From Swiss-Prot:
Pathway: tRNA modification. It comes from the Bacteria. Its cofactor is Mg(2+); [4Fe-4S] cluster. It is found in: Cytoplasm. [4Fe-4S] cluster binds at C138, C141, C229. GO terms for molecular function: 4 iron, 4 sulfur cluster binding; ATP binding; magnesium ion binding; sulfurtransferase activity; tRNA binding. HAMAP family: TtcA. The gene is ttcA. It comes from Chelativorans sp. (strain BNC1). One of its GO terms (biological process) is tRNA thio-modification. Keywords: 4Fe-4S, ATP-binding, Cytoplasm, Iron, Iron-sulfur, Magnesium, Metal-binding, Nucleotide-binding, RNA-binding, Transferase, tRNA processing, tRNA-binding. This is tRNA-cytidine(32) 2-sulfurtransferase. Pfam families: ATP_bind_3 (PF01171). The thiolation reaction likely consists of two steps: a first activation step by ATP to form an adenylated intermediate of the target base of tRNA, and a second nucleophilic substitution step of the sulfur (S) atom supplied by the hydrosulfide attached to the Fe-S cluster.
């Protein structure tokens, strides 16, 4: 993908160096290209959306899924190379899901020497009490989790909460709002919370989910499945994912085009009277 003011290829450090978590990473040309691409795309997001303020402290949400592992790895890699002048604190919120393997994340983070906080909050019981058994838990679960992460960010003196949403998450959200919400809205790479005291950052905004899958496989992250609670993600999001995959299969490169479109809005060619003064438009 090409964006305005692209990060220079010459600014990329040698892929042989990096954080110790890459000590056992594949040495293949293909994996090194993948790793360099993720680094470049994250740095591009930093630039495009002014995410980095030197000296800040970031709370990096770590669920145990491929996306959050990939996010943490890229951030640690950039920090190790001197390209991310912020302090990182990894955080996992144990929400009391059945059979959640409590040892995996603390063991992984301790072994790598990554500063972290493990927080236990039984939101699972709250969700199962309020949501009928045949409905998906994901929406309420996510809202409760976000509230606790904001609180933890405040307690830890973190200015930003960093999440692992990627390119496909943004596009799926856009089309869910488009088809089901009747509005043009996606998932912003940078957002100020309602209280105005914590920024939400999504550095993987330009990263493809397929790349994150390959990266996780190469790094052999100890993945924790996201369906421990027995609930499945909403049917609407699954339908949007299937639609996007079908479009990309038939017309390769369309996802990149869609992401570029979200950064190229023409209010005068839409119907929102709050964004464009149609009443004041006329022949002089």
């Amino acid at each position: 993908m090409t964006f305005h003011q692209p990060v220079s290829e010459t600014a990329q450090p040698d892929e042989a160096s990096g954080h110790p978590l890459f000590a056992d990473a594949p040495s293949s040309v293909e994996f090194n290209k993948l790793r360099k691409r993720l680094l470049r795309q994250v740095r591009q997001a930093f630039e495009d959306f002014t995410m980095v303020k030197p000296g800040d402290r970031w709370l990096v949400a770590l669920s145990g899924g491929k996306d959050s592992y990939g996010l943490l790895a890229v951030l640690l890699d950039l920090k190790w190379r001197g390209l991310l002048p912020v302090e990182l604190l990894a955080c996992n919120l144990d929400q009391g899901q059945p059979n959640f393997p409590k040892h995996i994340l603390p063991d992984y983070l301790t072994r790598l020497g990554v500063p972290h906080r493990i927080e236990y909050q039984d939101t699972y019981s709250v969700v199962t009490e309020k949501i009928p058994e045949n409905r998906t838990y994901c929406s309420l679960c996510s809202r409760l989790r976000r509230g606790h992460l904001y609180r933890i960010a405040r307690e830890e003196g973190c200015s930003s909460l960093v999440l692992g949403h990627h390119r496909e998450d943004i596009l799926e959200t856009f089309f869910m709002n488009f088809f089901h919400g009747g509005r043009l809205a996606a998932m912003p790479p940078k957002l100020l919370n309602d209280e105005g005291d914590v920024l939400v950052l999504r550095p993987l905004a330009y990263c493809a989910e397929t790349d994150l899958v390959k990266f996780a496989e190469g790094m052999k992250f100890p993945i924790i499945p996201c369906d421990l609670c027995g609930s499945q993600d909403g049917l609407q999001r699954n339908a949007m994912k299937a639609m996007l995959e079908d479009i990309e299969r038939r017309m390769p490169g369309r996802k990149d085009t869609m992401i570029r479109a979200l950064a190229n809005v023409r209010p005068s060619h839409l119907l929102d009277r709050q964004l464009f003064d149609f009443a004041g438009l006329g022949i002089l």
